[in-house]
Amino acid sequence: MFIKCVIGGILLFIGFVGHTNQLYVAVASNFYSTLQQISSEFTASTGLKVVITTPSTGTLYAQILHGAPYDIFLAADQKRPDELVKKGIGESKFTYALGRIALGSIESFPEPTTEDSLKKSFRYLAIPNPELAPYGHAARQVLTTLNLWQPLQKKIVMGENVGHTFSLLATGNVDLGFISLAQALSRTNRTNTWFWKVPLALHDPIRQDAVILNKGNMEDAKRFAAFLKSPVVRSKIRQFGYDLPELPR
């Protein structure tokens, strides 16, 4: 499946060759809905259409290594952007958001979702694949910190990324799932009792870095990077459930 995602992402671009006025953005699945909202404003002000691709951070990283011609990569970690800079594939790296995770429950879950929900009776718990998705890595850290990683092994269902995990939860295929706080807040038809905002003390910080890719449309990618750093856009990113890093002076 992973190899198919890598090849599929590269083939996706065959039909794009020669197109102008488009910016190709590879974005981690947790930030997809947020990017959809803010990219429309970028298009309105610049005339550039933003074309978004959104598997897991690990899958996007592999696609870039295999030549997928994205212009800018918005990861859910620092590791992959760092590696791209070291390999001479990317530059101008910066942190655009600090991710937060939440534990969500299905509609019929009998009580408010809290840390204790993990210690009670349920069928399945979905988490993003820790090897591919930074939010999955954080979820594994949470369970390990709570001494639940081994006891819950038979109940854990792995999603490819946090978007897949959210789908498993939304369709009722699992009772509980670790998702991004942004996804939790997006479900406006639910009360806040359906998710638990995981304390930062239970996992390492999720620093989400962006990197401009050297083989892409660097001029417009830099315009988009400046757009992400603007006060108005940073305020909107916070509204979607992210913390914000301090910008370098």
Labelled PLM ranges:
Residues 11-19:
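Hydrophobic h-region of N-terminal signal peptides that target proteins for export
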Residues 1-7:
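Bacterial N-terminal signal peptides that target proteins for export
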